[in-house]
């Protein structure tokens, strides 16, 4: 098989966008596939694709190709401000189709449809429209050359009518090698809540932080990207207290946080974006056997409720306070 990524395969795991490509590559290898890897700089990808063409001309067969999209448009996925008009990745998809190699891609996100370009990339209105046009160009190419798009959830397709080809849900998975969670707090005077994830206008957790500040029996650890916190700190500064810790960790550094928590929180203010987006941390909480507190009418909340792995609540301080108090008084709810 062929594994394609339009840039250097990320080695950091600060977010789902950096964690998933490497995990998928490892999964294919563990399944026994002989993987032809195409990634790296533009020149690296050109060289590897030329080598691939030579192998195919020599008679080598490939079952299929799988690609992971970047969170950036393909033409600027290397981080350059100006597009790479070499279009090497688009030409790769075209070549696969000509050769009869079915190509599927995991299409990561459509945050760009929800006014996040100015916040995430620091773009003004004109530049935002320009970058959106590059995202739309991606979809045109995918429709023309790919066999299937894998999406985080089926609901994402409803928000993306530009997708004309077959699409299937492929949400984040579980790493069964991770350590399972064991409750071992001798001091049960506090209920320890962990929030791991981004903070933005589409990921607002003010009711969670506000509730923790109100009650002495609650303790909250927020683990988020350093740049997200620098941007969003003003929103939450009035809620901060000595029972709310903010840290910036990733990868294996997260293990002690999971081990020391009683609950994993995905308690966001609901919005259209959250109704179809599956949080990577939802599945990482599950890996570590943490009960999950999520918001009703979000993808995470629906998943938690249907699988009975925690609590799915309206985004209301009163309901949240009542539930957390009940859990604190009877910790058997955590089992």
Give the ranges of each region predicted by the language model.
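A short, glycine/small-residue-rich beta-strand->loop->alpha-helix junction that serves as a flexible
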Residues: 6-22, 74-75, 79-85, 200-203
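Conserved donor-binding/catalytic core segment of Leloir-type glycosyltransferases
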Residues: 184-203, 208-215, 220-223
């Amino acid at each position: 098989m062929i594994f394609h990524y339009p840039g250097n395969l990320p080695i950091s795991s600060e977010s789902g966008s950096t964690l998933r490509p490497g995990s998928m590559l490892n999964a294919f290898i563990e399944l026994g596939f002989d993987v032809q890897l195409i990634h790296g700089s533009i020149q690296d990808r050109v060289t590897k694709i030329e080598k691939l063409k030579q192998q195919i001309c020599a008679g080598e067969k490939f079952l299929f190709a799988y690609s992971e999209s970047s969170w950036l448009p393909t033409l600027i996925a290397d981080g350059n401000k100006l597009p790479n008009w070499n279009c090497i990745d688009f030409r790769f998809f075209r070549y696969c189709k000509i050769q009869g190699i079915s190509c599927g891609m995991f299409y990561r996100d459509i945050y760009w449809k929800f006014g996040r370009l100015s916040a995430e990339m620091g773009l003004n209105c004109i530049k935002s429209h320009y970058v959106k046009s590059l995202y739309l160009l991606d979809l045109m190419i995918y429709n023309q050359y790919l066999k299937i798009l894998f999406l985080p959830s089926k609901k994402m397709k409803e928000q993306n009518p530009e997708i004309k080809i077959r699409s299937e849900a492929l949400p984040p998975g579980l790493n069964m090698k991770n350590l399972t969670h064991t409750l071992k707090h001798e001091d049960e005077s506090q209920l320890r809540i962990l929030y791991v994830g981004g903070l933005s206008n589409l990921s607002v957790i003010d009711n969670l932080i506000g509730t923790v500040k109100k009650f002495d029996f609650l303790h909250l650890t927020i683990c988020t990207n350093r740049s997200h916190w620098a941007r969003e700190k003003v929103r939450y500064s009035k809620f901060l207290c000595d029972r709310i810790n903010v840290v910036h960790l990733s990868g294996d550094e997260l293990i002690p946080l999971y081990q020391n928590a009683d609950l994993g929180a995905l308690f966001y203010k609901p919005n259209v974006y959250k109704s179809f987006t599956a949080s990577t941390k939802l599945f990482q909480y599950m890996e570590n056997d943490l009960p999950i507190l999520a918001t009703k009418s979000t993808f995470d909340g629906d998943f938690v409720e249907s699988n009975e792995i925690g609590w799915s609540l309206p985004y209301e301080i009163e309901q949240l306070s009542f539930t957390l108090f009940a859990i604190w008084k009877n910790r058997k709810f955590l089992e």
